[in-house]
Amino acid sequence: MVQQGFTAALSVYKFIDSVDKNMGDVLVTGGTGGVAVIATKILIKLGYSVVVSTGKLEEQKEVLLNLGVKDVIHRSEVDDNSGRPLLRPRWAGVIDTVGGNTLATAIKTTNYCGAVTTCGNAGGVDFTSSVYPFILKELLYMV
């Protein structure tokens, strides 16, 4: 649990320098994992509006809502396979604990001047993206 707490705290620490709590919703991926739950709790305590994605929507939605999250979405909503370099902006920022295509989709859907931190690879160590989100949205990406 110590490693999960440290990883979550480090991701949030880097994140809050770039994303103000009034900028909009923050997505936390892998919502029922240890790092994601701790990051979610920290963000909520700091006053951020948090949306969590999970593959365990039916089993864990109430638990996550009881933590104080704004919404819980299915992980398929952050798993785009369209090949488009940019998608409709949804998030002020993202704390990604999954990696893979979830990370690529999170980058595509982050708002202008948003930030994405990543600290996990349960969804895979490789991801495909383009430079467009970084150039056109002035996106900040942190590992």
Which role fits each region the language model picked out?
Residues 101-143:
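Glycine-rich phosphate-binding loop and adjacent beta-alpha segment
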Residues 78-90:
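Short amphipathic alpha-helix with an adjacent loop that forms part of the alpha/beta core around
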Residues 75, 96-97:
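Short, well-ordered coil/turn residues at beta-beta hairpins
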Residues 2-76:
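Mid-domain Rossmann-like dinucleotide-binding core that forms the NAD(H)/NADP(H) cofactor-binding site
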Residues 55-57, 76-81, 120-124:
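Short, acidic/turn-prone active-site loops that include or flank metal/cofactor-
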Residues 69, 90-92, 134:
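Local beta-strand N-terminus motif with an aromatic residue
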Residues 92-95, 117:
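N-terminal Rossmann-like NAD(P) cofactor-binding module of classical short-chain dehydrogenase/reductase
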Residues 59-60, 81-83, 101-105:
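Short acidic active-site motifs
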